[in-house]
């Protein structure tokens, strides 16, 4: 299924990083904070004034957007104003 964001929205896929304690114990998802880093999957046609393209990594507001599930994968539909930064690695 393909989802195309409307207006000034983007479809992003959160990047989940495995968290371990100093002792090497892997923390379950319920003990971790929400991810704030994501990959841009689709961009709405009205998104302007930001230098972001599909495939870029971004930092977004912690509780922004609407979480959706597509083909058993987690995504977020988010307003362009909730994108805080572009990550360059």
UniProtKB/Swiss-Prot annotation:
UniProt GO cellular component terms: cytoplasm
A GO biological-process term: chaperone cofactor-dependent protein refolding
One matching Pfam family: Cpn10
SUPFAM superfamilies referenced in this protein's UniProt entry, alphabetically: GroES-like
Molecular function per GO: ATP binding; metal ion binding; protein folding chaperone; protein-folding chaperone binding; unfolded protein binding
InterPro entries linked to this entry: Chaperonin_GroES, Chaperonin_GroES_sf, Chaprnonin_Cpn10_CS, GroES-like_sf
Keywords associated with the record: Chaperone, Cytoplasm
Gene3D superfamilies: GroES chaperonin
Top-level division of the source organism's lineage: Bacteria
Assembly mode: Heptamer of 7 subunits arranged in a ring. Interacts with the chaperonin GroEL.
Role summary: Together with the chaperonin GroEL, plays an essential role in assisting protein folding. The GroEL-GroES system forms a nano-cage that allows encapsulation of the non-native substrate proteins and provides a physical environment optimized to promote and accelerate protein folding. GroES binds to the apical surface of the GroEL ring, thereby capping the opening of the GroEL channel.
Protein name listed in UniProt: Co-chaperonin GroES
Species name: Kosmotoga olearia (strain ATCC BAA-1733 / DSM 21960 / TBF 19.5.1)
